[in-house]
Design a protein with these regions (language model features):
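Positively charged, helix-rich recognition surfaces that bind polyanionic ligands
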Residues: 1-192
């Protein structure tokens, strides 16, 4: 979810065993609900009016959706609290092209579950309340591809390369931490 320039890493809640277990249960319950509707349709019943068992199953699916949403929201709030409780002078975030990421069918589910905009807006509001300057880095600033040590832009860096190795100076760092350090020091930003 977030990597901070001081090296702290906030994990993606959707990769936790608890979230995966809930998603697995949700898929199972949705399949059961779908089968109930299909059986009702085969028997000639109206799908507009649901039986008591269908209503119970719909309620259990809704509860699971709510539990997953609460789990994600809680994690989001905990991360935001951890970020602002140390009262930094400023917080800089990337202006991500979420619309473009949503067009990639391999990324779209993960991106929508992350709720980037919601996270950024909550963080902005919290920073504003506390009095922390909130910066949004330019969308086209190459934070991941720029070497933090020498400033060289590694234009051929692929997304699957998780370790950044500068071809000029040999600087080696975790790709996301390198991006966090670059975002901290960037002059390409606007204040939100």
């Amino acid at each position: 979810l977030a990597i901070v320039s001081d090296g702290r890493i906030f994990e993606n809640i959707n990769m936790s065993s608890r979230a995966r277990r809930l998603e697995k249960r949700l898929r199972r319950e949705q399949r059961r609900l779908s089968r109930k509707y299909e059986m009702r349709k085969k028997k000639g019943g109206s799908t507009a009016t649901a039986s008591a068992n269908i209503e119970k199953k719909k309620l259990s699916v809704q509860r699971l959706h709510q539990r997953l949403a609460n789990l994600r929201r809680n994690h989001e709030n905990q991360v935001i609290h951890a970020l602002v409780e140390q009262k930094p002078r400023f917080i800089t975030v990337e202006d991500l092209n979420v619309t473009g990421m949503m067009k990639n069918r391999h990324l779209s589910k993960a991106v929508s579950e992350q709720r980037f905009y919601s996270f950024r807006e909550k963080l902005r509001r919290k920073a504003e309340i506390i009095g922390i300057e909130f910066r949004i880095a330019d969308r086209f600033y190459l934070s991941s591809k720029t070497c933090h040590a020498c400033g060289h832009v590694h234009s051929r860096l692929k997304l699957k390369a998780r370790i950044y190795v500068c071809p000029v100076c040999g600087y080696t760092e975790d790709r996301d931490l390198n991006a966090a350090l670059n975002l901290r020091d960037t002059k390409n930003y606007r204040i939100a």
